[in-house]
Swiss-Prot record:
SMART domains: EFP, Elong-fact-P_C. One of its GO terms (cellular component) is cytoplasm. Its main location: cytoplasm. This is Elongation factor P. Involved in peptide bond synthesis. Stimulates efficient translation and peptide-bond synthesis on native or reconstituted 70S ribosomes in vitro. Probably functions indirectly by altering the affinity of the ribosome for aminoacyl-tRNA, thus increasing their reactivity as acceptors for peptidyl transferase. NCBIfam families: efp, PRK00529.1. It comes from Ruegeria pomeroyi (strain ATCC 700808 / DSM 15171 / DSS-3) (Silicibacter pomeroyi). GO terms for biological process: peptide biosynthetic process. One of its GO terms (molecular function) is translation elongation factor activity. It is found in: Cytoplasm. The keyword Protein biosynthesis applies. Keywords: Cytoplasm, Elongation factor, Protein biosynthesis.
Length: 187
């Protein structure tokens, strides 16, 4: 595994640090008036989700880990485990449902997601950035309601509540950004 200097750490890098695998969530490069430059890094443990703030000097060396990325197709859920199939090898794997966190409701049958592996252990799963959902409940459209930046609550077919523009009505299909969990556009 390649070693990188502390000032080369970027958000999204996976590092081996203190015997664990950590993802750099936020990186601030600081150059104080006195003393050497350093990187203040917010790390998230890929195995248990705990967070850690660490300071790396420019001269510090850290192990950067490359994760293998594979597309996996969602098949079904069983006993809190999500079952996926590798599209190339047709091999099935089970992942804990909490691996997707609050984005779990956006997972749909047959959806292809990106799973990151380290030495055949699944560490992270990423949904597509945009997903199409149906609005099952929202307030009716009121004509003449054109106040700037006004949004109304809506409940999607997966139970998630999002804010939508006033012109969007019930039973309409919309596109939701899975990273921000916000309305993106009409489908």
């Amino acid at each position: 595994m390649p070693k990188i200097n502390g000032n080369e750490i970027r958000p999204g890098n996976v590092l081996e640090h203190n015997g664990g695998l950590w993802a750099a969530v936020k990186v601030d490069h600081v150059k104080p008036g006195k003393g050497g430059a350093f990187a203040q890094v917010e790390l998230r443990n890929l195995r248990n989700g705990s967070k850690l703030n660490e300071r790396f000097r420019s001269a510090d060396k850290v192990e950067r880990v490359r994760l293998e990325q594979k597309d996996q197709q969602f098949l079904y859920e069983s006993d809190g485990m999500l079952v996926f199939m590798d599209a190339e090898t047709y091999e099935q794997i089970e992942l804990p449902a909490d691996l997707l966190g609050e984005r779990r409701p956006f997972l749909q049958d047959g959806m292809t997601i990106l799973v990151e592996f380290y030495e055949s252990e699944a560490l992270n799963a990423t949904l597509p950035q945009k997903v199409t959902c149906k609005i099952v409940e929202t307030e009716p459209v009121v004509k003449g309601q054109t106040a700037a930046n006004s949004f109304k609550p809506a409940v999607l077919d997966n139970g998630v509540k999002v804010m939508v523009p006033p012109f969007v009505g019930q039973d309409e299909m919309i596109v939701v950004n899975t990273e921000t969990m916000e309305y993106s556009e009409r489908a």
